[in-house]
């Protein structure tokens, strides 16, 4: 059963990471939203479904199963797409290795859907 105290701590750490990273994904560098998505999708002329993949998630740099905590130094802000794809793998790669892999794909416009690049959401 989830611990409400841990959930609250993760939420605070995610928010701190979002601010520290200037609202950009740790892996792909894409702009993200935290809280109410409507301001984000209206500002970038997106459909709500499009904005969903750019929702800020709290990414454990050291997985909880490996002893990671919800402390701010172990949480990075990652877009939902990057977080999902990292953990969909059989063995999630180390954060730095995954970031390098993602950035190479971003450079080829081969990670996010074309509209992300067209809207200028990736630096």
PLM features: residue spans?
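The −1 position to Zn-ligating cysteines in a subset of zinc-ribbon hairpins
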Residues: 23-24, 57, 78
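Cys/His-rich metal-chelating microdomains
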Residues: 31, 64, 81-85
């Amino acid at each position: 059963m989830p611990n409400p105290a841990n959930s609250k701590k993760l939420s605070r750490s995610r928010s701190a990471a979002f601010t520290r990273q200037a609202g950009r994904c740790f892996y792909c560098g894409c702009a993200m939203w935290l809280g109410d998505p409507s301001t984000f999708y209206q500002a970038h002329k997106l459909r709500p479904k499009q904005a969903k993949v750019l929702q800020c998630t709290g990414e454990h740099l050291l997985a909880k199963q490996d002893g990671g905590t919800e402390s701010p130094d172990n949480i990075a802000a990652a877009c939902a797409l990057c977080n999902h794809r990292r953990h969909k793998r059989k063995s999630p790669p180390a954060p730095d290795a995954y970031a390098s892999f993602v950035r190479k794909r971003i450079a080829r416009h081969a990670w996010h859907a074309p509209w992300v690049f067209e809207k200028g959401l990736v630096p």
